[in-house]
Amino acid sequence: AVAAKLAHPERTVIAHIGDGGFLMTGQEMATAKQYNAPIVAIVYNNQGYNSIRMHQEAQFPGRQHGVALENPDFALMGESYGALGLKVTRDEEFLPAFKKALAANRSALIEVQTDYEYVTPNARLSELAGKKLAGD
């Protein structure tokens, strides 16, 4: 996202990332600040590496390992990088938070807290137990 903003500073750049991915790459918020390349990062916090958990559940129902996370406060983490930090816990909170992020004139991080059971908006892990997934 930072490279996209540097290449096209006139554009609004929005990064969508899961909590596990952000834990591995969140330092990009510091890079955005350092190079004055404000982005909006939307971090979906489901307290786990659920893309990995999804495959474990499909292949080994009820036997997930190493996929639950104890996460930091991502909104506060964004603030520590000089970004506007926002937290969303209900659907109706998202649009106002998104509008604030777009108007911030600096980077913003929106932490969207989601249920651990959801892998995607339409798929619950309990529904995947024992099902063959593409690539498995």
Place the predicted regions along the sequence by residue:
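Thiamine diphosphate
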Residues: 1-136
